[in-house]
Structure formats: C-alpha cells, structure tokens
Amino acid sequence: MASDEDSDEDFVTYGTPLEPLEEDEPSRKPIPVHEQTVKDEKGRYKRFHGAFTGGFSAGYFNTVGSKEGWTPSTFVSSRQQKSEKHNARPEDFMDEEDFGEHGIAPREITTTDEFASERKDQIKDKARAVSSLAALIPGDPGLLEEFIAPARSSIGVELLRKMGWKDGQGVGPRLKRKPRKQNTGRVYGCSLPRNGSEESEEDDDEFAPENVTFAPKDVVPVDFTPKVDSHGLGYRGLNPLQALGGGSGSGHINLFTLQSDRTTNLFGDRASGQERRGGIAGQAFGVGAMEEEDGDIYHKDSMSNYDNVLGGEEPGDGLYGWTAPQQYTKKKNALKRVMAYSGRILDGFALASEVTEIKTVYPPPDLPRDFRPVHYFRPVIDPSTVSPIVAQALQLSRGQLSQDASQQGRHKLDSTQRRDMLGESALQGPSSVFELLESKDRERLTEIRKAAESQKPSESNLSSAVDRAVVVASAKAKAAALQALSSRFQSSSTQPQPPSETQMALNAWSGPTADASKTFKPFSKNPQKQARYDLYISKLKQGDKDAVELSLDSSMTEWERGREREEFVRAALLYKPSSSSLSSRFTHGKHEEDTDTVDVAQEQENDVDDKQAAVKMKMFGKLTRDTFEWHPDKLLCKRFNIPDPYPGSSMVGMPKVKRDKYSVFNFLTIPDGSQVNPSDPKPSSSTIPRVTAEASSKKSRWDVPVQASEPKDAVSAFLSETRSEVSATQQTEAEVKTQTDALPASATSEVKVAQSVEKQSDQKNEEEEEEEEEEVRPSMDLFKAIFASSSDEKSSSSSEDEAEEEEELAPPTSEAAQSTTTSGTVIPPIPAQFTPAPDINKAMDLKHLTVQSVPSAETTAQSTQSSLNAPAKSQGLDEEEFGPRLPPPGFVPSTHSPQMKKQKKKDKEKHKGKKHKKEKKKKKSKKHKHKGKQKKRHEESDSSSDDTDSNSEDVDRDVPTSELLQRLKNLKNKR
Amino acid sequence: MAFPQPRPQAPQLPQHLWRTVDCQQGAVRAVRFNADGNYLLTCGSDKSLKLWSVSRGTLLKTYSGHGYEVLDADGSYDNSQLCSCSSDKTVILWDVASGQVTRKLRGHAGKVNCVQFNEEATVMLSGSIDGTVRCWDTRSRRMEPIQILDESQDGISSLKVSEHELLTGSVDGRVRRYDLRMGQLQVDYIGSPITCVCFSRDGQCTLSSSLDSTVRLLDKSTGEMLGEYSGHVNKGYKLDCCLTDKDTHVLSCSEDGHVYYWDLVEGSLTLKLPVGKAVVQSLSFHPTEPRLLTSMEGRVQVWGAEPEDAAENES
C-alpha cells in the first residue's frame, strides 16, 4: 500500500534500526564484545547489575554518591531562616529514568483540572471508594462533599457557553433545515418495526422555514469502553437485582443491550423518540413464550438492511419538532421559482442564494507611446567644475533640447527650467547632480578634463573629442541619475546602497568570464527569489545597468524590494564568476544530511580588530583572550587520568548551535552607516565592505607578516565606462598597440580579460582568488611571464629574486619577456607562448583562458599597486605551503660541491637584496640571464649526481613541467 | 623554613660545542631529546627518523616507514615508544627496540607538523596543517582518533602537552590552551602566525614565538604578557623556541644562524650563540641539565655549559 510508506514516519520506534544491507559492500568485521556497549539516552554507559539488584541503574549511575541520594541533608534552622518542613515525596527517591517513558512513574504532559474534560478520574474514584469505607454515610462517600463543592464546569463548556451554546444542544455551526433523509436509520441484524413518530416526519417539509437555523443535535461522544467479558456482542448477562428483585415493571429481563451505551452513542438520535419493544426478539431466538405475536418468525433477511457504505448520511430530519407557519413555506416556494435553474446542479454544489453583482472593470489608462518607466534626471553641470569642452558639449545638447522643449511639454524640461518658468527661487540644497556625485566620480571627471586639456586637440580633432566627451558625460549623468533614483526609492529603513557595489557587480558579471550554468544558487530555498536572482544575473551579464530594478518583483513592498536589492547585489558580488569556476570543479554532494542548518560554535570569538589593536599596544590579557567551554572526550580524560569536567554530558568539543545554512546574511554583514559614507573623502574606505576588511586582515597573517594592509587603489576597483573609454583608450591603448603589435590577437584579448578581472578585484576578491590559486593553479609559465615582466617594469628590486628564479627556470621565455618589458605599461604583455589555441572563439578555450588569467591579473594588480607587497605575494605564489615554511634543506654532504656553496651564498645575498630599492633594469636582466644559466647548470649537475635525492622539494616546486620532462629524459638516457 | 635557601647558582648556559653529528638524512627537520635526555631523535627530510646517543654521538637506530620527510618526533616517558609525524599526513608509533611500526595512523588531511605524547604515553597528539589536532589512542587498536580539535582556523604549527593541558600554536595567530581538567579552551590572540609554543617548566607560563620575529611569554592564567623577546630573525620559517631547564632563559632559533638567549625576567639578550651560516631550524633543551641540541641543515650540534672535558671530569 502506498500509504504505508507515509505512515512509517508516524510510528514511534525504539532502538536503533539496522543499517540497510548492501550487496556489494565488503562484509564488515563484527563489533567485538567489549565494544558493544549499552548507553542510555544521554550517552552514559549502562552496566547491568542484575534484574533484582537495580537493573541498569543501581546507585546513581553506577557510582556511589549522588546529587541527593546518599549525602545526608543537613538541618539548619535559624531565627532568621526557619527551616522549611520538608516532606519527602516518592519522587525524591526516584531516578531520572523512573520518570521516563518506561519508568515506574512516567511523567507526561497532562491537562490540568481546569482544562480537563469531565472524564472520570479513575484514581480519584478508587480513592473515593477506599475512603467511602470510612465515611460517615457508608456507601456514598462523596455525597456530602458534592453537596458542598461548587459546581464547576470545564473551560470548554464555559467557552461554548460564551459562544452561545446552550445545554442540550449540539456543537457546530447552526444548520438550515436539511432535506429529508430517505432512510432514517440503519438496522443491523434484527430490525425493529418502525414507530409512528418517524412516519409523521414525512410531511414536515412544507413547514420548514427558510431563514431559521437550528443548533445541531447533540451527539454524545462515542465511548469506547473495552469489552472485558466473554459474552457475545451486546449480551449483558443477567442482572441479579433485576431478575430476582423484579426491578422493572415489565417483568421482562432484557439480556441484550440494544439500547446500551454503545448504541445510543452511535445512533443516539434514532432511538431517542422510540419506544423499543422489550423482550428477546429476533431471528435466532424465535418467539418467546410470553410474546403475543408470532408473525414474523421466518423473517427473511435482505441486503437492503445492511449498510454497505462507510460513513453515510447523517440521520435526522433537522426539524426538532418545530412546526413552521404556513407563510414561510409559501415564501420558500416563491424563492425557489425565482432561482429556477435549468441545468443540473453538480453534487457538492449549491445554487447561490443571491446573484453576485457584476463589477465594472475600468481599463487602465493608455500610456503615451514614448512613455518610459524610468526617469533620468537631466544633468545640471556647473561649468566651473567641468572642462570647457564638456560644458560646451552639454550646452550644445541642451540648447537643442530647450529649443523643442517648449513644444514638448513640461516633462522635457529640467527642473531649473521649470523653476525659472514658475518664477521660483533656487533651492537651498545641492543645486547640481555633481554635488550628489561621489568624490571619486568627481575626481574622475576632473581627470578627464585634465586629460582633455593636456591633449589640446587640434581643431579637426576637437569635434570628435567633444562627441566623445558628450557620450561620456551623458553616461556619467545617467549613472548618477540612477544612483539618485535608487537612493530615492529606498526607504529610510534601509541603508543607501553604495552605488559602487552595483557597479562592481556589473563589472564582475558583464565580462565574458560569466558562466551561466555554473553559478552558485544562493536562494535555492526560495525558487521564486532564485528566479528573480537569475534574471538579475542574466541582466548583469548583458551589461544592463539597472538590472536590479528590473528583476525585482514589482508587487512586493518597497521595503522588501530594497532588502532584496541589497541582497542580490551582494550575492552577485560574493558568488561572482571567478568563484563559480572554482565551484565547477566540485560536484554537489548527493546526500546532504541536513540542508537547513549548519553547526556553528555557540560562543563566538570577539572582534579581531580589537585584538589587533590590543596586540599593537602590547596589551595582552583580557583583550586578547577568549575563553570557551570545551568538552574533552570521555576517553581522553580517562587516558589523561583526569575526571571528566562535564560528567553526564555526551557533547564533545565546543558547544554548537544550529544556524540557518544558506541565508545570505550568515555570510554578509550589512554595512554600518558609519562605513558607507558617500561623502567620505577617502576613496577606498567607503566602498569596501566590512567583510573585506576582515578578510584582508586574515590574509595578512597568511604566510609572512605582510605590511599592514594598505588602502588599495580605488580606481582599479571601480571601473566605469569613462575609464574604459577615455583613459584606457587615450593613455594605454595607444602605447600598447605600438608595442604589442607583434603579439597575436589572442594575447591582447586575453589581456582584456585579465583587465576586466582586475577591475573587479578588490581586497576580498583577492583573498578568494588566492585561495583559489591553490586549487586552480595555472601553468608555471604564466607566472613566469608575469613576474618577469611586472618586476621589470616596476623596476623594483624587491621582486628581483623571484624574477631570477623564474628566469633561471625558463630561459627561453625570459627573452621574450625582455623584449616586451621595456615599456612602462600597466598591462603586462603576455608572450605569445601562453595562448596555446589561437582560436579564441571556442567557448572552451575562452573558459580556459579566463581561469588562467585570474591569478595573473591579480598579481599584476598587486605589483602595480604596491611594490612592497610584491615579494610577499609572489612568495606565497611560489610556495604551495601554508603557514611557516621549512628552511631549505641545505646540501647533503654527499653532494658537497663548491658550486652549491656559491648558490647558497647567493641565496643569502638575495635575502639581503630585498632591502635594496631601485636598480637599473637592464643591468639586472643581464645579471639574471647569467645567473639563470649558472643555476641551471647547477641543478642539472645536482640531479645527475644525486638521483635519489628526495629532499629537493623546494627546487622541485619551481621547476616547470617542461624541464621536469627534460630531466626525466636525461635520466632515461643514462640508464 | 628553618634553613635559608641555598644561594642560587649563576645560570649556566650551554655555549660550548661538544660535538657535531652529521645525520646523513637530509635536512634535519627537528631534533628532540628523549624523556631523560640521554638520547636524541632527529627527523630527517629523507623520510627517516634516527635515534642517537647524546654522549657518544653514535647512531643507535634508524626508523624508516614514513612516506615523506619527518617533521617532528617525541619519545615516551619510559623510552619504550616513539612517535613521529610526517609530511605524508601520517603519524607513526614506533617500537623503540625493534624499530617496527606499531601503529600508523592516517586521518590528517595535510602534513602533520607536530606530535607529542601525553605524560603517560597513552595518547598521541598531532597537529597538522589541516588545522586540526587529533588525539590518538595508543592503548586501543582503534585507528580513529579519540577526539579531533578543529577549533583552529589555520594550520597547527606547534603543540605541547602537559599533565592536563594541551597547548597549540596555529598559523591563524592564536595560541590555544585546552584545559582538560577545567573543560575550557583559552585562546590568546598573538596576531602573527605562531611557529612554536612551549610551557614553562613550572607550568605557569606559555612561550610562543611568531613570525613577527618575537618570542612572547604569556601568563597562563590571565593571558597577560610577561615578557617579550626580540632581536632574532624569524620571518618565514618554522623555528623552535624553548626555555632552559631552570626557566632562567628563553631560547630561540634564528634565521641568521644563531641561537638567541634572553634573560627571562629582564628580557635582555644574554647570549647570541653562533651555530652556523644557515638557518637554525630546531632546538631542544635537556630536561634537567644545561645542554642544548640545535639542528642546522643536515647536522645536529650538542652544546654544553662548559667544555666537554670539564664536564666529564666532574661526572
């Protein structure tokens, strides 16, 4: 049966179920006897003491002494504190498990007297019976008591009375008169002849009024008294009092309880008006000697006497003896005529008593054809803050607009024009959108102006420059308007969304890196929300600027929308494509035990920032210390010869609490108002959420004490269209093009990918990507090229040794790198070698490339940002290790060679060399070449002289696969 | 007291080189005295663990069975068992006399940095780069750890066990003290990745060295800093630190080839013992006498308070 599976869960089970047997599983070792332990529900071991000496719980869980049991209580009584009289109850001497489900005094939740039904209390009855023996009036114990005791009705009855119920009525909604039943009663077995009362009901129909309702009939609840005797069904046996004393007038002894409790309960209404024929009657018994009639002896039973439908119709006519006046019936008939309905009425449906009014629906107003649901504010730019070209361009465009503004109505006018037309005075607040802009954006605009000024384009160029500026400015203004819009729509309860975040999300997703199918689904719990999020992501990918607004559900309240907007943007940032490429490496677990919750340590550590501050001030102690509850394993305590600090607790480790697993708010912290301050003069602090700040601090202790996390260049974090259009084109692109002409097209496209990734990389991303590097490690070649080039172009000697190493590892590529590194470009040129498949249109290749370029972009970004960070960073890249490293193994005596010593020295020098600052780049590269060759020779000699040397781990790490192959070949040749 | 305290002797610092042992096992990742200080254990990067006599400098036994370089070792109190851990993610319990592997315990997800017996050698505790400390039962044949302490957010670099406490230093910059008797975990934030932790001999203080080239002495009960010792170089490598046998001085390895001695109370640099040119990777102080072991690259040096001849004459 299908329902079996469902009902399985409803069963109460005891014990542990056997694990399902799997066929292909290797047969497990049986658990040895000494490991088969019995534990109670708290995980305490149970020892069996014998059934008559305490069972499992002799003493206080197999120990002497207990909380209360064995320690003598002290009697203290003073003047101030009188000792209370302590009545020992039996419960005081019971164990915990005695109160359990199977104990001798099980504790269960019971209803209090007040709420209890009037069911008889068996215990009380017994008590009463006992006390009755000693009562004043023998035989009737509670008689006096019941006289005195106040009448008390249960709370249910009280409630019912309040609701209008009266004694004797049934419970339920009041009924209209029911259509008459055909068969008022069922008879099982012996049927009794009908009485007159039932026949009289037949013509009740016309008296039933329409608008009078009746309380339902009272139904005595079914009392399932168990059958304890061995008589047949319904047979009561002789009541000696009745039989001998002649209690009943009829002189007839009724052995059958046809009107017993059972039947009355079930068919109470049927029998109510009936006077039953007494005596033994029925087929099986024939006609008694005292009966007058003997007609129906050979009664034939027919199937119509049996009920073959479970449940069935409710007996009763619903009239309750009330005779309706004549006019009611007439009215009813009239109504019936009005509502005459030609069709058949389906079962379970009834004709409506009233005709519903048809509501008139007004169509929505027609929208004008050029109506757009989003309003863009027209920029009002102060000519003093913008370059003359931009201002000029704007004026030009506005001039055009204002010309036809008069014809097109007020929507085409901007606020100042309208103000002028109305003759109002200027508002006190910020007069231009520019003041609403963030300082960064303003800076950027000034940058544009500077760039434009420095260029001083010729007259012929001017027009194109103006065009471009117009485009840029309008895009700028659009963005600003959007920001203003979004901030306006957000209610005051939510923080204004830092506009940079939407921008960042856009940047993160709009690139070709986004892979639709493999994105993480943060709202998979809520499919609708997830659908909305998916829409948002897909819009992001298309580069839609107001993706959030469009993807939100318009039917939601404003507050909800604001909330969801924030969530989406953050989720988009968090689960951006680079991390999805990571997640694509893993498959989801087939079997999740509990998807809703995750264990989280109950006590959380204090703020790390505070601690860092304390450490800086050398104020160790309370500030830097956290104390947690920690539960050692029982066995561990035993092995350490230490009493269990938490006896009776089966927990191990830190106390855990369940938390929701996939709520975004577990991972995100809503930025504080203090942190997100749009008017913050500092460029970076206002835009980086708190999470990232923490993350960066975590990162800093990664391997080497990195310098305190410097504020990163904000420009790289937010890349607006302005930058890509103006600065990129004007400054870098030209240079890049002139110098990297030799590179194949694929390389440049990859550079672009790298750039786009770089754009989005704020500190948080870096950390994630750093972790990712451990997993998705690109080929060594890529690192080499980047380091070789970036270190050179920065011309900082700090990364000298890395470059050295890399060059020594790959002499062929170093030259390629050199040729390209003479430039001072921001974008690292990547040698052609690294684009194995020139066909970039293939999706696979593209993906491959993007994966590779993630770390590279990151490292380059770092190297360009802070030369100080570079050594630490690249060290981390070189090392696969976490935490403090192991010193180099030095040299094994067997491979003692002067050359090696030399290398050692150089190593030292390298360490010192970190402190040097700048050096000439060309000189260095020459040196590198030289060194590289030398070292390569060393290594080769090393590997040839000592093949079995296994401690060259450090060396091995840095060796590219190509060289490893070469070495292997050498080995083979020797053999 | 009826008798005045005997005048404390001037602390003797091991500064005379007694002998150098070339271990022939690659880089010596760790050098450890045994429980009574008569023998020493060297963990080689060639996957072998070696047992030496301190007084004669002779090799007694080589224990091979690890799959990668051995990173730490410890001897039981009764010298009957050894434990060692390795980059191959295993912890091995050895029988000293036979040199056989008694138990090879797998479970760590990364290389195992440190291992210790508890006082009665009933439990081995191993800390790994995977951020967990695992407590292995040596008594039963269970291959699963008794308990896994996964509170650390980063790799465990060092670990020490006292009678009822467990001290771990982690790369997440925290020193954790698990007090079994109290059922408490106390976390002290240092900030910089911890390379080594020690208890003081009196058990009241903890010593921790971190990658900011600082050794700190913290009060065990309150977490307050009692002393800060710096001057040495410890920026990238996992180096050891320790206290002398009488808690008078603090010792630390350094990347500049010296062992630094600081006065515990004053915090001043007492001695800068030149060991060699490379990094002094590991050191171990004799449990009762002023003797020191240092390891640099493939060699182990034994240092005494006075020249060896004088010491031998005395004894």
UniProtKB/Swiss-Prot annotation, chain B:
InterPro entries recorded: G-protein_beta_WD-40_rep, WD40/YVTN_repeat-like_dom_sf, WD40_repeat_CS, WD40_repeat_dom_sf, WD40_rpt, WD_repeat_MORG1
Family matches, as SMART domains: WD40
Listed GO biological process terms: mRNA splicing, via spliceosome
Domain of life: Eukaryota
Subcellular location: Cytoplasm
A cellular component term, taken from the record's GO annotations: catalytic step 2 spliceosome
Coiled coil start-end: none
Keywords: Cytoplasm, Repeat, WD repeat
Swiss-Prot/TrEMBL WD repeat ranges: 23-62, 65-104, 107-146, 151-188, 189-228, 233-272, 275-313
UniProt function note: Molecular scaffold protein for various multimeric protein complexes. Acts as a module in the assembly of a multicomponent scaffold for the ERK pathway, linking ERK responses to specific agonists. Also involved in response to hypoxia by acting as a negative regulator of HIF1A/HIF-1-alpha.
Family: Belongs to the WD repeat MORG1 family.
Protein name (Swiss-Prot/TrEMBL): WD repeat domain-containing protein 83
The organism of origin for this protein: Danio rerio (Zebrafish)
Lineage of the species this protein comes from: Eukaryota, Metazoa, Chordata, Craniata, Vertebrata
